[in-house]
Swiss-Prot record:
The keyword Lipoprotein does not apply. It is found in: Secreted; Target cell membrane. The keyword Secreted applies. It comes from Opisthacanthus cayaporum (South American scorpion). At high concentrations, acts as a pore former in cellular membranes and causes the leakage of the cells. At submicromolar concentrations, degranulates granulocytes and has a weak hemolytic activity against human erythrocytes. Also strongly inhibits the production of superoxide anions. Has a strong antibacterial activity against Gram-negative bacteria but is less active against Gram-positive bacteria. Also has antifungal activity. Expressed by the venom gland. One of its GO terms (cellular component) is extracellular region. InterPro entries: Antimicrobial_7. It holds the Pfam family Antimicrobial_7. Keywords: Antibiotic, Antimicrobial, Cytolysis, Fungicide, Hemolysis, Ion transport, Membrane, Secreted, Signal, Target cell membrane, Target membrane, Transmembrane, Transport. Its main location: secreted. This is Probable antimicrobial peptide Con13.
Length: 81
């Protein structure tokens, strides 16, 4: 096969596949966006946030508002000790 013909074939294939792949990835992105903003996902995110806050408050022995007043270095020392 001639090199120039192979190059033309590859360029045409790239031009044809690029819109097809773009449509495929946009559908995946739309589905992920709908799933992320769904009521179930919002409920799970809020539960995870509350669990993280409770873990930190139990670990450092302070309420979340008190934990906000602790300097970062002391906060990290308490978490990893």
């Amino acid at each position: 096969m001639n090199r120039k013909l192979l190059l033309v074939f590859l360029v045409v294939a790239m031009l044809v596949m690029q819109p097809a792949e773009a449509g495929f990835w946009s559908k995946i992105k739309d589905f992920a966006k709908k799933a992320w903003n769904s009521p179930l996902a919002n409920e799970l995110k809020s539960k995870a946030l509350n669990a993280a806050k409770n873990f930190v408050s139990e670990k450092i022995g302070a309420t979340p508002s008190e934990a906000g007043q602790i300097p970062f270095d002391e906060f990290m020392d308490v978490l990893y000790s």
